[in-house]
Amino acid sequence: YRRQRQMCIRDSLKTTFLPQGVFPELPRLGLAFCLAPAYNTFTWYGRGPQDNYPDRKTSAATGLWKGTVAEQYVHYPRPQDSGNKEEVQFLTLTDKQNKGIRVDAVEDVFSASALHYTAQDLYKETHDCNLKPRPEIILSMDAAVLGLGNSSCGPGVLKKYAIEKKEHTLHIRISKQ
């Protein structure tokens, strides 16, 4: 959904992902929006404050958390996905006047991240020092996210933390903050 002047989704946005056929292991199933640079304050009710994933979330307490979008990215030597928040009930991205957008879970919690990078930005660079943040904000909201596994060496993601090849639904309500 893209609107130039004013965004208004009166009821809710419901997207269902139904995998068919053979496909590779996916990192996430969801939607991504590009938002104006002014909406730089990220607040969420869910797991935090550190980034967390399906297989690494027990150390992240459920609560109301707040930070800048830049603070959500974790500088690993090799750029990779980071900043994910699990079990999000609602989030806001706001400017200095506390105006912006709010996203609420409708049926079930969702995963989310707000970064100054797209997935393509992260995966095309081999060193963190070469990464250039975008001024705009990339808001990802997901029905399912792949666990991290052992990332660097050894076994990958355990089967129970992989994205199951079944129907996944993201049901959210987007409104003005």
Where are the predicted features?
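Beta-strand/loop-rich accessory regions of lumenal/periplasmic or secreted enzymes
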Residues: 3-6, 10-177
